[in-house]
Structure formats: C-alpha cells, structure tokens
Amino acid sequence: MSPLVTRTALALLAGCACAAHAADWSDTSLSYRYGTKFAEPFNDKDITKNIVNLSSVSGYKYGKNFFSVDFLMSSEVDPSSAGAKSGAHEAYALYRHTLDLGKVTGGSWAFGPVRGVGATAGFDFNSKTDAGYNSKKRMIVAGPTLMLDVPGFLDVSLFALWESNAPYNTFTGAATPRYAYKTHPMLTAAWGIPFNIGIPLSFEGFANFIGTKGKNEFGGDTARETNIDMQIMYDLSAAVGAGKNTFKVGIEYQFWKNKFGNSDANNPGATAKTPMVRAEYHF
C-alpha cells in the first residue's frame, strides 16, 4: 500500500474516532431484503439471496459519517464450496466520512444547485465463502463530494479507488496472493428524497460508475462497471403508531453491469437485473 493511501487511512480513522464522540444527530437502521434474480460472474443461474443490513449515519460539527454492513446469504446455486449443497455467505462493510469544507472554513461553498462541498474518504471490506473465488476485497476511497440542494439529500462524489483482493478457488485449491489493481476512478451518487402522493414515500439509492482497473489478478482485462441500486420506500410508521421514519417497506431494483469489473461478454452472470422487496426498522 502506498504512503498516500496509508496516510489517508490513518486520517480517516482519526476523524472517525473524533466524530464518534461528538455526533449531533444519528440514524441507525436494521433492514432485510430478498430477491430471486441475483447473479454472479461465471454462474449462469438465477441466485436467490436473503440480505440483512445494519447501517448508521450520523452528523457532527464538521461533517458526517456513514457505515453499512451487508450479510448476504445465497441459495445453493451459488455454493459455499465445490460440491456443497449449502449456499455462499458474504459480509460486505462500507464506511465513508465526509468533511464539510464550508463548516470547517466558516464560509459558504454553495454555487448553483450545490449547497456545499466536502472531502470524503472511506473503505470497503468484504469476505465471502463460496466455491470459485472467496473474495477478500480491501479498498480505500478518497475524493471530493458535492452536496446538492434538494429535499432530503443528494451527494455526488468523484473518488480514486485503491483496491486489492486475494481469492481462493476451492475447485483447484489455488490461492492467489493479494493483488493490487491499478488505481481507478469512480463517479458515485447517493440520495434519499422524500415525496408525498397522499402517502409518505421516499426515493432512495446509489449509483456507481467505475472505470477499468487494469489487468485482473489472472492477467485478463477488466471492464467498466455500473451498479445502480434504487428503491421506493413507504413510511408506515404512523399506521402502526410509531414515530416518523421508524418503519419502512418498499420495492428495490438493482442493475449491476460488468460486476466487479468482469465483462459480461460471453459471461451472462456478470450483469444482474434484480428486483427485491425491502423492510427497514430505524432506531
């Protein structure tokens, strides 16, 4: 790992530790989603997944933090090992810290539709137990963020990604030493926009547009990646006598092309088109 990435990681951890003791507001949620049309590269079968998520977002004097961890449980067509009758299991964690430059400097950074500008850093970390790859992804991200002036929030960021992996294939017993991909860009947006058509709804989600990352660990080319995940959520809290935004249910759709940088040319599992149902509890 380069000195720049190391310094970024240390600064990130320091910011996280400070912010954790000074949160002005926070929202933690536990959610469940389910779909039967998930896909994985080099697997031509539709995969059913049950996904449990724990997320937390908080704000403090100079910015905000976001942490999320998915626990993904696949059906047996995405097996946990070669010849297994059980499905794969995966944990995927993500953290982002955004430093609001206007709050730091005491001046306005607003222009046009932009209400503020931030500097964001964070990490992705995953571990999956499956038959063919057993991903152990490690990734540092950093870059500028534009915070748009909309109801709710809409943040647009341009990140540099420092990503590595160390896969293991249970079919061959081959372990690949940790491999660092070429530093590559990601244009990303995240949003949560409330609206009302007689019932309280919100449009939420994220979109990632990721550049190629050089050769993969096996010497093959990587492809540009698109991952759009969006949902319409209904706030049913009032109907059950709870506070606003405590209980939400909705429908979700994910379009993920060239998953993990694997081209979908002659590889149908590399692109997923997945409808889901989703339920959330906020506390």
Label every PLM stretch briefly:
Residues 1-25:
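Cleavable N-terminal export/targeting peptides
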Residues 22-72:
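Short glycine/proline- and aromatic-enriched beta-strand/turn motifs that initiate or cap beta-hairpins
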Residues 223, 232-283:
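Predominantly the C-terminal beta-signal and adjacent terminal strand-loop region
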Residues 54-58, 95-101, 142-148, 160, ...:
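Residues on the lipid-exposed face of transmembrane beta-strands in outer-membrane beta-barrel proteins
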Residues 21-27, 57, 62-67, 101-118, ...:
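Short loop/turn motifs that connect adjacent beta-strands in outer-membrane beta-barrel proteins
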Residues 34-38, 71-75, 121-129, 160-166, ...:
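Transmembrane beta-strands of outer-membrane beta-barrel pores
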Residues 68-133, 218-225, 264:
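Surface-exposed loop and membrane-interface regions of Gram-negative outer-membrane beta-barrel proteins
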Residues 48-52, 87-93, 134-140, 181-187, ...:
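Residues that define the transmembrane beta-barrel architecture of outer-membrane proteins
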